[in-house]
Swiss-Prot record:
This is Serine/threonine-protein kinase PAK 1. The modification Phosphoserine is found at residues 21, 57, 115, 144, 149, 174, 198, 203, 219, 222. It comes from Rattus norvegicus (Rat). InterPro entries: CRIB_dom, CRIB_dom_sf, Kinase-like_dom_sf, PAK3-like, PAK_BD, Prot_kinase_dom, Protein_kinase_ATP_BS, Ser/Thr_kinase_AS. Autophosphorylated in trans, meaning that in a dimer, one kinase molecule phosphorylates the other one. Activated by autophosphorylation at Thr-422 in response to a conformation change, triggered by interaction with GTP-bound CDC42 or RAC1. Activated by phosphorylation at Thr-422 by PDPK1. Phosphorylated by JAK2 in response to PRL; this increases PAK1 kinase activity. Phosphorylated at Ser-21 by PKB/AKT; this reduces interaction with NCK1 and association with focal adhesion sites. Activated by phosphorylation at Thr-422 by BRSK2. Pfam families: PBD, Pkinase. Belongs to the protein kinase superfamily. STE Ser/Thr protein kinase family. STE20 subfamily.
Amino acid sequence: MSNNGLDVQDKPPAPPMRNTSTMIGAGSKDPGTLNHGSKPLPPNPEEKKKKDRFYRSILAGDKTNKKKEKERPEISLPSDFEHTIHVGFDAVTGEFTGMPEQWARLLQTSNITKSEQKKNPQAVLDVLEFYNSKKTSNSQKYMSFTDKSAEDYNSSNTLNVKTVSETPAVPPVSEDEDDDDDATPPPVIAPRPEHTKSVYTRSVIEPLPVTPTRDVATSPISPTENNTTPPDALTRNTEKQKKKPKMSDEEILEKLRSIVSVGDPKKKYTRFEKIGQGASGTVYTAMDVATGQEVAIKQMNLQQQPKKELIINEILVMRENKNPNIVNYLDSYLVGDELWVVMEYLAGGSLTDVVTETCMDEGQIAAVCRECLQALEFLHSNQVIHRDIKSDNILLGMDGSVKLTDFGFCAQITPEQSKRSTMVGTPYWMAPEVVTRKAYGPKVDIWSLGIMAIEMIEGEPPYLNENPLRALYLIATNGTPELQNPEKLSAIFRDFLNRCLEMDVEKRGSAKELLQHQFLKIAKPLSSLTPLIAAAKEATKNNH
């Protein structure tokens, strides 16, 4: 990674700026901003059953690493609980039957047309259940681990679809369901943040309507007397894990004492400056007295942390996974009832500011993609899936350095977004296999990287201004999103995007493979990002 700064004497021309900011709240009704949703929907891509299955575990971690396994609490496999929802779909009338009332209300306001519902009722139910599961899951993030020893784990969860004559048959799909509290859910994607005066961002998208809880159950639908053919029977069986006894507060404190550093952080760090405040803690920048390094410190009141057990796991994992392209965990301390976590600090802000305020050329985009792929190759080789790749989670140094953040415990270093606990962020960057609740692996990060590359081209991801549920539907059914002006891109860049945004997971490139792609060979030095960072910071300052 290059850290070369610009020669102050060679003043480059001002970087190209976007004419208007593309950041629009979710409530925007301007039809001119709907760039992606109006195109006709292609046929639902044929789903190929994956050979490799990734079993996801929060606390058990990578079972191939015995040392980590010993240090992390274990969670049992799902067992002895079955929850069934029966929903019917009449392909003649195009109406769902037996749908929970809250789901029906959500669907009514989703902007998913009747013809779209009739074309793919399965996708409609997939996104409704996905949205519902994210509404009920805890908003705190944690890393996902792939477990090679469990690739052949077969869940008994199935989704069976029977169709009437007017609708082509959809094959049964086997999927891995998640427990809201203990199993690793797909990532909850935060909404596009507003500009703020620091690298830390806050939510702007309003909370969505209330969805039905996971425990909503309906009776199986009986065929109505006046129907000549029964409605489609869409039956979802879900399992829930048995809960293991949680660690007591004293046990958690005892474990934390064995992990954190001994000593007074107020003597090691000086020049504290508050830069963020959240429900669970306060974020400061500070200076390491010994090295002069600027750091970010989050001070968290442990009594206000809903999942204290996860904190232990994340510190252990962060301590063991360090990389030049990751915003790294540096240290931690117990100060009274507070846990202080020290992380690297990057003063350049997030990539979001750059993509929304300036125009990047292909060489600069290639440089960012290369740095992100280096971080992903490292994480994936250590059986860690980031699950939340987007411009908001890429931080920049003033020298142009590019680092991935907001994975694992890094999620806790950002001030909590005020609405995150009461809403589900729209997953613009999320891979189709996640939205449709299939088993997934590290390549979900590659899809998200492809969407982030579109951000760098167009200033925003596809479907940003769509209703959240419709955005989910389009991700599940549209396949690879279309670019606004694909003819303006080079052939090698288009090929790189196609490799990232391949619907067939087995054909999608891995981080290791994509690091060899020809597109990355045109990458400019990282110092070429410095003028863009400076221009974005100036534009952000002028907007307030």
